[in-house]
Amino acid sequence: MGNALTFLYGKCCKPTTTDDSLGPHGVSAATVGVSALAHDLFNFEITSQVPEGLGRYVQSSRKAQANWYRKILEAWKQAKPPPQTAEEASRLVTDILKRNQKADVEGLLSFYGLPLSHTLVEVTVEAPVSLPEGILFEFQTLPVDPKAVADGDTITVYVSTSEPVVSSSVPREVNLAAVQRAKAREKRNYPKADELHQKIIDSGYRVLNIENEEVLARKFRIRLRGIDAPESQMPFGKEAQEGLLKIVGRKSLKVLVYGEDQYGRCVGDLYCNGIFVQEAMLKKGLAWHYLAYDKRPVLAKWEKEARQKRIGLWASSNPEKPWDWRKNNRRE
């Protein structure tokens, strides 16, 4: 069995002890999708049997279904890296079965809860060669804590004090506290170490454990420039937050900072593994183009594409604009 399928099966698809936690393919509801498909491919290679429930979703015979799984299994093994997201798995299946009936392909995707081909979006995978006009500075973040994604357009990141943009401005007392904390931990004086760490945190810094190495880092709150996602309390607010989390969670980001907003947040463009995060959010229908603060035509173009496909928040005929919602729900 290929390593990718073995890993996904072992990590994501172990049976749980309660029936309530199982999804339609014998795995937890949270893993239905990529890992469920990997689970069934794993079983198919061993038994040559396709899932029992698939026949309710497709029209073709079980013999034809077995042929699909054989092709998908081979393509999955050859993919480097193998699919890790629902979108990647959907593209692989759609490409391999492109000569089959559309109803069968969409039925197979629906069986696994994977996005249908017409809802997939293509995102540019390249960072700018030169800095756009108006950039004040840039930095590379440490991996993003999933808990730090507040909503669909705001995240908190940490930047190592070894980064040039940060290194020259670290307060002396923060550096001193970091050294003293390390010594306290060596002596197993953890109460003292915790007290010193709190002092560091209160100053806008934190000591993070990155790959078993302690890194002193500065905290930045980032507002994604040019987009406005639904607020957490709005319809589709949770989906927008989860969409951004899927893109940036546990990954390092390249941030191009244009300035600071009235709340002290850095306003910037975000790149994750070469993907322009705002582009992904707009194309997936997870945010509006914030025209009042960013006139870039390409942002309007990406929003228009999502509107035409009626994906994400655009599945609603008249979604409420975040800025209108904030105006009508101002805090006293």
UniProtKB/Swiss-Prot annotation:
Arranged from A to Z, the UniProt key words for this protein are: Calcium, Cell membrane, Endonuclease, Hydrolase, Lipoprotein, Membrane, Metal-binding, Myristate, Nuclease, Palmitate
The protein's location, in the record's own words, is:
Cell membrane
Catalytic residues in the record: 223, 231, 265
This protein's source sits in the domain of life called Eukaryota
Instruction: Name the SUPFAM superfamilies for this protein.
Output: Staphylococcal nuclease
The UniProt annotation places Ca(2+) binding at 153, 228
Lipidation, N-myristoyl glycine type: 2
* Lipidated residue numbers (S-palmitoyl cysteine): 12
Gene Ontology terms describing biological process: DNA catabolic process; RNA catabolic process
Enzyme Commission code: 3.1.31.-
Cofactors (names):
Ca(2+)
Q: What is its main location?
A: membrane
* Known partners and oligomeric status: Interacts with CYS6/CYSB; this interaction inhibits nuclease activity of CAN2.
Protein name from the UniProt record = Staphylococcal-like nuclease CAN2
